[in-house]
Amino acid sequence: MASRVTTAGRGVRTLGALCLGLLVTASAAAQSSYSRGQGVWPAFEGWWQNDDGTYTLFFGYMNDNWEQVLDVPVGPLNNIEPGGPDQGQPTRFHPRRNLFRFEIVVPADFGDKELVWTLTANGQTNRTYASLRTDYLVDKQTIATEVGANRGGVSQDWQWNEPPTVRLDADEPRRVKVGEPLTLTAWARDEDGIPSSTKMGVTLRPQGPRSARRDRHPAYTPPRQIVPGTNNGLRFSWYVYRGEGEVSFDPVQMKTWQDSRPYANSPWSPPFVLPPVPEDGKYEVTATFDEPGTYVLRALAGDGALFSWQDAIITVDP
């Protein structure tokens, strides 16, 4: 399956659209937290124009559950129209906010048309409407801010940022039996080093009660920003994009969704520190499947601001 890469774009999203995105995040945070039983909100993240005159529409979603992972096959309960029902959307929905999960390229004459993504999960039907409204125009800075790069801050350098590159081993088998480990190999690199690496580390100063309050461990510090902050620097993970069975990865992969709880194995989770980048950029993992079927496993690389991915289609036999 071809990769979808968040790359160069032009234009600046208006303040109104950016504030809308922040309000959605704030509203979600203000609601009562649920472990399971809630719905999933499809999200239109924005658009930009490509050099050839076509447009890229960006989509993500908000799973209102903190623990429940939902599988919704493409069809009446998960469709994008017109032109669907299958337009590359996920069928596995991981918890909480998952930003910029897939893209749809529309022609230069798309005009005032719109795409509608309808999603029903846990008996709740929600929709998002994608169009070329100017208040949804995004650029690299907008994307970086919304995913939490530099704690949701801004940097002029990000306009020159390019996403990491991802490559899969094309010679590896893509067919396996239930319970049989499958080796997956990928290479990921961040060639430009933008944004520069940061760490959500901890610096403690053992001087008096006031200093202790100021420098207390981030695990016990309430959030002070609407957008969850993340480390800058190369990170890589495999995750299930489509498929209804459980997949176990060894080693365990860091989360690709915004889990901001302390010690949650997530780049948005304090005091998480990104693992060292292999010198050769090679990442190797084994995946074990507990049910037969066809799976799409996504190899996702990010630098804290932009993402690239490649998909591996795996056939699992009984």
Where on the chain are the PLM-derived regions?
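Short, compositionally biased P/S/T/A/G/V-rich stretches that sit at domain boundaries
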Residues: 40-44, 135-177, 183-185, 189-195
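Extracellular acidic, Ser/Thr/Pro-rich low-complexity tracts
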Residues: 63-65, 174-177, 188-195, 226-229, ...
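Low-complexity "stalk/linker" and mucin-like segments enriched in Ser/Thr/Pro/Ala/Gly
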Residues: 90, 205-283
